[in-house]
From Swiss-Prot:
Domain of life: Bacteria
Gene source species: Desulforamulus reducens (strain ATCC BAA-1160 / DSM 100696 / MI-1)
UniProt name for this protein: Nucleotide-binding protein Dred_1927
Keyword hit for Nucleotide-binding: yes
Role, per record: Nucleotide-binding protein.
HAMAP family from the UniProt entry: YajQ
Nucleotide-binding listed as a keyword: yes
Amino acid sequence: MAKENSFDIVSRVDMQEVLNAVNQALREIETRFDFRGSKSRIIFENKPEITLISDDDFKLRNVIDILESKLIKRGINLKALRYGKVESAAGDTVRQVVTLVQGIEQDIAKKIVKAIKDSKVKVQASVQGDQVRVSGKNRDDLQLAINVVKGTELDIPVEFTNYRTI
């Protein structure tokens, strides 16, 4: 019987690393001269969203820059962030909600499957919930499928996990 190899394509964010990045960003905001006396803060409660609050749009943009730099240093891909619109908040402040993308949405999963099928690589790709499973007889074909997915323009960060031989 021939062995079947497979792997999963997933999109996930390490919430502990996000928490660490938020804490580092808060520490920098507290110590920076241009934020002295400011109402700028970052709220993250282990939900897949971060709330940014600041005095005005300019300081909010600076808070975003600080947060993004800390996320990059912690290994979080910025494609995993979805920015909401800037809205007015209480006390002459502005607020913006940043959502963290977890899982692969159906339309993006279909795009991945289509890209793999269009490449004519001898593998099967199927959507399974919020991930895509790719299976095939040859490991080299799986490597080609990984390269196809890496070459596809996606709006989310993807990881290749759960390699196995059945």
